[in-house]
Structures are given as C-alpha cells and as structure tokens.
C-alpha cells in the first residue's frame, strides 16, 4: 500500500494552477498497486536495442520528480517501468505501447518520463523569458506540452492528480498551468489557461472534440511533445476517429509527438498506427499471457473426467512430439506429478519430474535439458521460481493454478520463442507454440474467466461458451453475495471498466418481483436523483393496459405499519447471508435493508461486529452502501414479507451528451433542481417499457398538471426533452438495444407469466358477469342471498327499510295533496324534495356494495391486491378484539370495485369531543354529499369530467349527535360530534379504505398527557396528594424515550382516559 508522508504540507499549499473547482487530492495521486497484478517479469519487443534499468538509482529523472516519488512511497521499480522509463526518455520518435492488467503500475510506466519532459520544456521556456524579452502570447507557446487522453471523468481526475503531484515543485511560474482538466461548465477560464500555456492537459476524447468545436480557430498545439492514450482499449472506434480528425487540425504537419498507448490487451491495428508516427516504437508486456497470444501461441481448452486427462496428454504428445517440441507439463503437486509420470512411462515417454525435494543433481539434469531436450518431458509445479526456462514450445496444463496470475506466469516458459512483430523483418515462427488446458470437475471453475479472455482474441467454440455460462450461474448462486448489476450496463448496455467489481451476468434475482407492475403507466413520487436518467421513486398509482387507474398502498401508512411490526428490543443479526432482509440501525434511524455481499466468515459460532457487509436500502431509498455487521438486527418475519417502499426508475437509451460514460455531480444537481422546482399541484407519470432487476425502465418521465381553464390534464414537463435541450443526454438506440438484449431472458419469462395470468382472468370473467346479472334482476332478494357477510346484510336491510319508508311517505303525501285543506298543503310543501333523490342514491350505493361483494367471493383467493389483504390481517392483530361485536369476527371478503366506482382514500383521528375524517379526492371537480343518519355515515362524490364515483358507508358504534363538513382543495373534512367526551374504541378494522392519521393521534395524545401531568403536579403542589418522586422520574424518562422514537405508535393511542 502506498502512503503519503507529507500530505498536510501539500494540501496546505494548494496551487491555483489546477482547474477551478478542483482541489489536489492525495487519494487520487496515490493509487495502491495490486500485488497480484504487478508482475516481476516483462516481455519487451522493439526495432532498436532496449536498455532497461535494474535499480531505482539508475533512473535519470529530475531530482524534484524523484523526491516527490519517494515522498509518495514509490520506491519500488517494477519490471514494466524499467523498460518504459529509459525508452520514453529517449526523445522524439520513441513511442511505446504498454500492455498490462489494470492496477499493475502501467499508468506510472509513462507519467514520470512525461512529467520529466514537461518540466524540462517549462524550464527552457522560463530561461528564454529571462534572457530575452519574450512575448507570452506568441503562437508557438499555445497549448499543452503533453496531452493525455483517458476514457472517463474518473480517470481524468486520477491522472491529473498524479501529474500535478510530480510537477508541483518543478515549476513556479503562475502564468503556466501545470495540470489542466477540461471544464464541465464550458467556462472561458479554460481557454485562457490553454492560451497561456499548459504542462499536461488531461481530457476524454469527447472533451477534446468539444473544445475544438467551441474554438476551432484558436486551438493549436505547436509545443506538443507527448500524446498519450491511457486505456485506449476502452475508447470506442468512433471516439478514436474523432480524436484523429481533431489532432490533424491542431498539430503542425511537420511535427509528430511521442505517442504512448496503454491497453489491457494487445491490438494489431493500434500498434500499426503507433509505428506509423514513431520510428522507434517499443511494445512492453506486463501481462505474460497477452504476450503469448501476441507471439503466436495457440491455446486449446479440453473438459473431461480426471481419469481421462492422462490420455489427453498422450494425444497432445503424439501431435507435438517431444523430440521436436520442447515440452513442459504443469501439475498441481508432487502426488499429481507422480501419477502422471507413471502413466507417461507406460507409454514409453521419458520424463524429468522436478519435485519439491529436488536436489543439485536434478538441477543439473534440468540445465542439460535446457541445452538439449532429447525428447525428455519436463514436469513441474507453480512453486518452482528457480526454473529459468524461456525456450519451451509446448505447455500442457494438467492441473490449473490456484490463481489467475500464476496461470498467466506459466507462459513465461515460451517467451524467448515469441515472434517479434515490431521489427519490420520479423522472422516467421518455424515451430508453432501450443498451450493445452485440461479441465475436470476439480478445476472447472477456472473456465469462465479463461473463456472471457480468449473471446477477446480468438473465436471460441460455442459449446465451451455455454458451459462457461452455466458454471458462472452455479457459482453465482453458491457465492455469498448478490452484487448489484454494473451501472454502465444499465446506462450504456456494456461495461468498459476492466476492474469493475459489479455483476455483469443475469441472475434469478433479476426477475420482476410481484409488487412491481409489468406494463402500463405509473404515477410516482420522486425520492432521490442518482443521475439524469436514474431515480429513486415510490409508486402511487398504476394504470394497466386497457384499464383504469388503481391506487397503490399509501406509502406513509405502509411505512407506519412496518414500524409497528418492529421488535422493540431486536436481536443481533448473525451470521449475515446474501439476499436476506434485516434491519439497519443507526443513532437516529431504523430501516430495512437487503444484504448484497458478505466478507468471508471464518467461524459462524463467533459473533463479529466489524465484519464488512454491503447493503441496499429498501424503504428510505435504494442506495447501496457498506457498513459493519454490528449495526444489523433481525427483521420480523411479517416485516420481511412487506414489499419495499422504494424502487429504481431508469430511462434506457439516453447516454451522456458528450460521449462520456458517466455524469458529473453538477449534472446531477441540475436535474435535481429541474424536478424539485415543479409547480405544487403536479404529479410525475411514466410509461413502463419493461421491468428487471427491481428497476422500472420507462419511456420518459413527465410532469402533468390539471388546467382549470381547459378542464383537462396537460403535460408540463418532459424530462427527456428537457435533458436534450440542456445538452445533458442524447439518444442512443444502440445502447437501448443492448440493454434490452441483456435483459431478454427475464423479459421473455415475464411476458409468459403475464399471458398466463391474462388467460386466467378471462376464464374467470364469465362467472362475475353472471353474478352481476343476478344482482341487477333481483335486487329485492338481497336479504336471502347466503354469500352476504354481516356488514352488507345490515346495509341491505337498512336500504330495504328505507325504500319502504320512502314509498309510504310518498303515498301519504299524495293523499294529502288530494285533500282541499290548505294548511296541510303548506306544511307538506316545507318538506325538502331532495329526500327522494337522496334515498335513491343511497339505495344505488348499497346495491353496488352488495353486488361487488358477491362478485369478489366468486374470484380466486389470490389476486393482485394481496397487499390490501395483508394489511387487513395486520389491522386485525393491532386492533383490540374486545371492542368489536361478534359479527365482525366473520371473515370479510375483499371488495373489487367496478370500473366507475371506487373507494376514496380516507384518514381519521379523534379528539375528546369529535371524530375527524379527511377524504382525499383525486381531482377538484367532484360534487360530494355527506350524510349522518343515526349511526350510519354516508359519503358519495361524483366527478364532473368522468363517470368516476367515490363512495363509502360506515357504521359508528359510539354515540354521536351531529356532523359538519367542508372541502378545501381536493380534501373533504368531516367532523362528527360526540355525545360523550370519551375516547371511541374505533373498531374500524372491517373498513379497509380507512387509514389512521397517526400524526394527529400523537398530537392529541400528547396534549391529553400534558393536561394530566399538569393536573397531577397541581395536586402535588397543593398537597392534596402525596408527592411520588420515583414515579415521576420513571414517567419523565418514559416520555423522553417516546419523544426520541419517531414514527412508532404509542401504546396509549386508543386507550380510554378517566378524567
């Protein structure tokens, strides 16, 4: 691990030469090198003689740069750097292609010599300014001395910090910018700095194209000495073509800088371009396996049983005779080697096994074999670094290595026989080079990675690819992690990061969960903006295809119910298992999370608190974060069954406008500002394209408002259009297609499930229609229908009696109209004529309820509204059973409303004198009526713009005297006055559309408690009662604890106080 010894001093002396808004970061300057990727060996080819340095003291760099590197802890000279540093310091024409694994020191293989050349050029420029009056604005001083192109913004900041760290002490002129990034805000300061002179300009290909388009006439790079393509394999062909066109415009025709290319894999096309501009190119490999493939080695893979591996070795030896091809066979250990030697000697092959107990005599035999093999086969293991063999022709991997780096290092045995393709007169390989990999049941897990590597260089048999895919799926299920999908795949359809640790394959967890709709439109509530095309939302309503809007469960009520289900003193969750749901506790919050990844657990019987786990939030948002398992607690089983409150929403096919692979923080802030400054009465709506990996992939996110003048909904904002206008995104059909192809497997499975469900619903629709017909033809026989529950039976009886009473009243009124007595006529004229309409509407409402209940009982037990059913069961548990009459113990069937009839969203709370209801209407164009008849409360609201009817009827089991109501906006406030100033037990569990308003319950509860506390203190102060200090302490402590616990229902909410 690399450390900074003087970090405080450097951060305190922050320079203004860095881009405005960016500060020097020590973390970016020192990136730790991964030991397994840093090879002690390298393969270097060139058309000139390479003179590698052996020790750090032999490095010829400026003293300031060497001192800075020592302060950074870069005291170790890697083999890769020992070739590149002296070669790049050779001057013009000395280009290089560096091929190595990420985090293997390949970036520092070019940065020190580049910074050395920049410092020398700046010192020469300063000397000229001191000796002669030199105009800084001369055209020959425009532009940078070194141009470094990197694939993404993250690498821009990392490479810039490295260059600035090495250049900070080399030059003190404030007029020249040492390290410059392309500004993401298109500021004019960037062009001014570029005109005044720049040491190192670090940019992405898209940024280079952008600032050339902004000022094509001003951009000239006459002083450019180095042109570096870092991670050139991660740049697309279109990006490289655009860069080439820009460079042809900004570089003089007579000037050709030193070109350096850094790549993970070798590419013949890029090497040809390098040789075209530099006459002394060098090709340096830090990855030995890449060097083997470059040099003409043919790799074969065979999968078989362990018993058949010896026969496969014999067949390979028959094809490539050891008499002509020097052969090395790798085994796992000495025992494996003994068995193979015995099998080969039976076939009359001469073997030279090199065991771990080999003595000097065996070493002498190996030296003789290196001079002349004479058909003898050398057998060894990976634990023999003293075998200095470089001229083998055939390598047979009888057993695979324990690590990927050791497997690649095996091919060092054929490095001297690799063809040098850099030389114009490269000799053709006389003997082909082979590498045979034998896999069995014990080492088949290495196949997926080996297949991925070979697919980059050669065609692989499709059967091997399928086997590798199955093995990868099995390993993913067995592994104790459920990594999130790679973000680049979800945005671009492909991952370009070679060291990405996210998941890049589909898994069973990517199928659409039941709580997310598969198609249609949704109304959502915005929770958080992750990027211009990635959001965290909560679902409010769903519009199925050819259906009507359906309310999703109210998130606030669901969240409160989940808090009630939590255990007050939960147990620690151990051992954590990937995919499990648990509780994450902090100082002030508790939330549900899903475990994604768990570090290795040595002993599950020993509970650890510092074990690292990766989690994903489920309710607050969908963020992914890491913590220690000491903050994890068990989650109740009922709470684990609850659907998550939050989900991800993405706009597929929209990519960064300038060709980047990610957005800046400023872009995210701008999008967040757009979505948070919408008008008050808006709602967000999106059309679902498909659902996968817990994410809604939608066509667009639009903000819709209701226009009173037109009496219609209008679109206020289209997010995709706004982002295009702000030059934040652009449409990429290729990315959209790749994303859909990536999820094709789970999308097809969801379509099949949806078709099956639709066929079941159509099969069940005929009995429902028959039920409706019976209810319409015989409304008077509702009392004798056996399927009616207690509640609907009471409503039907009441409606029947009301109709009879209304008929008798009409007959009496007609008779009185026929009599000539004027007084009677005037009295009857005072009776409101609206009673007839009121009772007819009441009768219609009750008939709808009864019809819907009969229709519901004929449906299957399982239906899409399972969340509502679960909430009823939960409410039964939380409600006091003694306060409910016996007939409410009967199971109430779930009512499925017709298309034009729906239950409104209603909340309630009570004070000491009233029972308060709040009815939420979807639009403000509803005409409503509310009526209190005895113990029955009726409500009905009819929309003016559609045939939608919102209604409910409920029975109050507490004596109430009168009712008042009013409407404000889209909310109807109903207040029912009590006859007695007591607390109603509120046995409302059979009314599923009613939701308690817990915030106001707590407020009333707190006021009553404060009143009671004041009364107790008053009685104690007046010495009417004995002061109880101990009880007071306990009471105050419990009050403080309740105040600190937010969102948890108090146990006194529904109790009756005796005052």
Curated annotation (Swiss-Prot):
Residues 87-284 form the Helicase ATP-binding domain. Its EC number is 3.6.4.13. Disulfide bonds: none annotated. Residues 756-787 are annotated as: Disordered. The keyword ATP-binding applies. Gene3D superfamilies: P-loop containing nucleotide triphosphate hydrolases (3.40.50.300). It is an enzyme of class 3 (hydrolase). GO terms for biological process: germ-line stem cell division; meiotic cell cycle; primary piRNA processing; secondary piRNA processing. It catalyses: ATP + H2O = ADP + phosphate + H(+). Residues 757-775 have a biased composition (Basic and acidic residues). GO terms for cellular component: Yb body. ATP binds at residues 100-107. InterPro entries: DEAD/DEAH_box_helicase_dom (IPR011545), Helicase_ATP-bd (IPR014001), P-loop_NTPase (IPR027417). A motif (DEAD box) lies at residues 230-233. A motif (Q motif) lies at residues 54-82. Coiled coil: none annotated. Residues 575-639 form the Tudor domain. Keywords: ATP-binding, Cytoplasm, Helicase, Hydrolase, Meiosis, Nucleotide-binding, Repeat. It comes from the Eukaryota. GO terms for molecular function: ATP binding; ATP hydrolysis activity; nucleic acid binding; RNA helicase activity. Its main location: cytoplasm. The keyword Nucleotide-binding applies. Involved in primary piRNA biogenesis in germline cells. This is Putative ATP-dependent RNA helicase BoYb. The gene is BoYb.
